[in-house]
Amino acid sequence: MSDRRQNRKTPDEQRKANALIINENIEAYIAICKEVGLNGDEMLILENGIAIEKAIRICCDGKYQEKREKKAREAQRADSNFNADSIGIRLVKRAGSGTNITYHAVVELTSRSRIVQILKSHWGNELNRAKIAGKRLGFSALFASNLEAIIYQRGRNAARRNGSAELFTLTQGAGIETRYKWIMEKHIGIGVLIADAKGLINGKREGKRGVDANVKLRAGTTGSPLERAMQGIEKKAFPGPLRALARRVVKANYNDAREALNVIAEASLLLKPQITNKMTMPWCMWLAARLTLKDEFANFCAYAGRRAFEVFNIAMEKIGICSFQGTIMNDDEIESIEDKAQVLMMACFGLAYEDFSLVSAMVSHPLKLRNRMKIGNFRVGEKVSTVLSPLLRFTRWAEFAQRFALQANTSREGAQISNSAVFAVERKITTDVQRVEELLNKVQAHEDEPLQTLYKKVREQISIIGRNKSEIKEFLGSSMYDLNDQEKQNPINFRSGAHPFFFEFDPDYNPIRVKRPKKPIAKRNSNISRLEEEGMDENSEIGQAKKMKPLDQLTSTSSNIPGKN
């Protein structure tokens, strides 16, 4: 047995290790919340949690701060009062008591140095080490990327620039900040690595600096950034000719290298690549779960397995989600908290590209396709309508997919033609095999005979699956279970429904797009950074909330929240 397997932690040991990190994150989150004046239930408002985590990631981004300090030096020549260390965070706060509670938006000022000081007091002084802050903030960045994938389909634009927009289901983690991308490599889709590899190939051709830099590779060696990217692609690619293609890219000429990467990406729509899936929640949700579970909290610090679903449900009972005026489609429309709860659930579990009918079969409430949702961008808006605890819960669970979906021996530009599985549940193939074959047939013949042989083998694999699509199943032998079925005694068979694609166009629903004319951009307060798009005075209020039942009447133990008066 290898040393790696011998050193593998048991589930109890892993949860205990997770709890140490999660508790440190929670304590840092509470301290920063207090620093910007958040107390009690305000810490459990989802939009506040997202804003605080974004501020932390930016404050820990050295390159961003270097650029900002450079701009600050230029600004100070024109404005001696400019403070490069100051940042503003847009937050939701409440006023009043009892049944007369209102919520309003404010921008609170703090400083990067103060946030870094708080983080060091909880995590240690070496924040630049991946082991200290990298993984913590990497999972935070992964959640933010998952959120953007659902709201904006961020991966689609990247896929379109680098080949076909139909490849967007391979772009998990496309929105992760560059600093955390390689730390989180095993959680990132193969399409993102392929886009990076193409960028490096283009950069080499154009003579850009940095493409020949020396970076760390696996097994303690060093090499170029392209070699590092291709190592990641080879590891993720379906076994067989796709991996052989990946090994040839580094030494291939420009045209052959790009062509080989296109084949790997397009074939991966059906020959599904490997990706490690985990549940990742914002720190405000972990705080909510800890308040409920108390001494039992460590037993639920899981990123996979049944307890990951349970701790998510527990957190959902206590958090608050804001409804603002203004959605992606209509500036005058009020957001739906039910829709935002669905987006939150899908972002925590990375479900943007999972079979939507499978996700629908695992939760307590009906779900909507993306184009039916009334949601904004999960930032704090101008007019707060309501703040409520969501009702959505998981009723079933499944193991996360960590292996290949298939056994190794086996004109609608931009439309979704494939799924990327998150849960290891046996299901029929949903991929449009004919469209994959059309994409692969666009490959032009070049002189490199070994490449042509590999292309032929890839097409043969695709063709075999296409001919036997009705008989072949992904994740053969795996099932989902009721949430109380801890021992997997009663597997539940899954049959894909009418809507396997979350981004499927719904012809029966045609929302009216209403956008107000853009207001002239006011001069930005020079003491507020570009962390948020708008600047304002520290004590300004934006909008007035409707009267509603307060969060502390919706939750049972809110009096235990740190900072609660």
Curated annotation (Swiss-Prot):
Organism: Influenza C virus (strain C/Ann Arbor/1/1950)
Region (Disordered): 520-565
Task of the protein: Encapsidates the negative strand viral RNA, protecting it from nucleases. The encapsidated genomic RNA is termed the ribonucleoprotein (RNP) and serves as template for transcription and replication. The RNP needs to be localized in the host nucleus to start an infectious cycle, but is too large to diffuse through the nuclear pore complex. NP comprises at least 2 nuclear localization signals that are responsible for the active RNP import into the nucleus through cellular importin alpha/beta pathway.
Biased composition range(s): Polar residues: 553-565
Record's subunit section: Homomultimerizes to form the nucleocapsid. May bind host exportin-1/XPO1. Binds to viral genomic RNA. Protein-RNA contacts are mediated by a combination of electrostatic interactions between positively charged residues and the phosphate backbone and planar interactions between aromatic side chains and bases.
Gene name in the database record: NP
InterPro entries linked: Flu_NP (IPR002141)
Primary site of residence: virion
Protein name as it appears in the record: Nucleoprotein
Taxonomic superkingdom: Viruses
GO molecular function annotation: RNA binding; structural molecule activity
Record's GO cellular component terms: helical viral capsid; host cell; host cell nucleus; ribonucleoprotein complex; viral nucleocapsid
PTM note: Late in virus-infected cells, may be cleaved from a 56-kDa protein to a 53-kDa protein by a cellular caspase. This cleavage might be a marker for the onset of apoptosis in infected cells or have a specific function in virus host interaction.
